[in-house]
From Swiss-Prot:
Gene3D superfamilies reported for this sequence: Aspartate/ornithine carbamoyltransferase
GO biological process, one term: 'de novo' pyrimidine nucleobase biosynthetic process
Positions with a binding annotation for carbamoyl phosphate: 57-58, 107, 135, 138, 267-268
Protein's name according to its UniProt entry: Aspartate carbamoyltransferase catalytic subunit
Enzyme class, first EC level, given as a word: transferase
GO molecular function, one term: aspartate carbamoyltransferase activity
Entries under InterPro entries matching the protein: Asp/Orn_carbamoyltranf_P-bd, Asp/Orn_carbamoylTrfase, Asp/Orn_carbamoylTrfase_sf, Asp_carbamoyltransf, Asp_carbamoyltransf_Asp/Orn-bd
EC code(s) of this entry: 2.1.3.2
Stored Pfam families: OTCace (PF00185), OTCace_N (PF02729)
SUPFAM superfamilies given in the database record: Aspartate/ornithine carbamoyltransferase
Designated gene of the protein: pyrB
Quaternary structure note: Heterododecamer (2C3:3R2) of six catalytic PyrB chains organized as two trimers (C3), and six regulatory PyrI chains organized as three dimers (R2).
Keywords of the record: Pyrimidine biosynthesis, Transferase
Gene source species: Leptospira interrogans serogroup Icterohaemorrhagiae serovar copenhageni (strain Fiocruz L1-130)
Length: 308
């Protein structure tokens, strides 16, 4: 098929054929990595890693992805270590980055910032998270994880648990899941419910959606996607303290499930996912992190127009 996504800015840009193509290419990349044949695909290419908001997994996995492909990385971490702290605009920063690198990955606390960045330059731009907006590469690796763990998506019951209001990983993954015949269970306190704009975007698709405050709804689900309460997004810290411990996933809850519920988490976790779940075979969140590297290797290659 003809895949034409130089920039990766949000999940709305991907059609079902795009996703089928991406999943297939990630499988190919995974095999190349297993056979030690991926190194050298992006030799001579330079990635600008621009993280203006805290990150461990996403930043390291993108940088590891570029290195594993034979490319190199230049980076900046935090506003205080960039000229933005001196008053430089994101537009000007990106114009400078364009002079140095072949592709840029950006995380920024302002929703919509990746579009500003992409509009400033001709090099590919990948959104690694823009405030409470989206995290498209996380959604793609999450999609790949579910398919790898379950063998399919169609017919699955998928629970999203925790902060559905501010959780950009949830916003992004739900946008991709609308292309599949799934049942979504949204488990959260009313104050952290999924925004109406995302619910409306699901209308007209073959999935179904149910909202509940009952954590035991996870017992009937094939996948439980757990997220932390996003403390940094709350305007009122007292509200965070009131809500942060309402939904907790532990071993006892998962073992009581009617199905072998696969547990996913984009990480980092705080106390919403107990460590006693870690030794269960259906705890897939560390495998999920590993899938992130091959997924991002694939996206880097495709954004740069390098087939494999």
């Amino acid at each position: 098929m003809y895949y034409n996504h130089k920039n990766v800015l949000d999940t709305e840009q991907f059609s079902k054929p795009d996703l089928d193509f991406l999943i297939g290419k990630i499988r190919v990349m995974e095999r190349l990595v297993e056979q030690n044949k991926a190194f050298g695909i992006l030799t001579g290419k330079l990635l600008a890693s621009l993280f203006f908001e805290a990150s461990t997994r996403t930043r390291l996995s993108f940088e590891a992805a570029m290195e594993r492909l034979g490319g190199r990385v230049i980076s900046t971490v935090g506003f205080q270590f960039s000229s933005i702290s001196k008053g430089e605009t994101l537009y000007d920063t990106m114009k400078m980055v364009e002079a140095y690198a072949d592709i840029a990955v950006i995380r920024h606390p302002v929703e919509g910032s990746s579009r500003i960045a992409a509009g400033a330059v001709k090099i590919p731009v990948i959104n690694a998270g823009d405030g409470a907006g989206q995290h498209p590469t996380q959604a793609i690796l999450d999609l790949y994880t579910i398919i790898s763990e379950k063998g399919t998506l169609d017919g699955l019951k998928v629970a999203f648990i925790g902060d559905l209001k501010y959780g950009r990983t949830i916003h992004s993954l739900i946008n991709l899941l609308r292309h599949y015949k799934v049942r979504l269970f949204l488990i959260s306190p009313p104050e952290l419910a999924l925004p109406e704009s995302y619910k409306k975007a699901l209308q007209g698709y073959s999935l179904t959606l149910e909202e509940t405050t009952d954590i035991k709804a996870v017992w009937d689900c094939d996948v439980a996607y757990v997220t932390r309460i996003q403390e940094e997004r709350f305007p009122d810290h007292k509200e965070y303290e009131r809500l942060k411990d309402l939904f907790k996933i532990n071993k006892e809850l998962i073992l009581a499930s009617k199905k072998e519920t696969t547990v996913l988490h984009p990480l980092p976790r705080v106390n919403e996912l107990s460590t006693d779940v870690d030794d269960l075979p259906n705890a897939a969140y560390f495998r999920q992190a590993r899938y992130g590297v091959v997924s991002r290797m694939t996206l880097l290659c495709l954004s740069l127009g390098q087939d494999f």
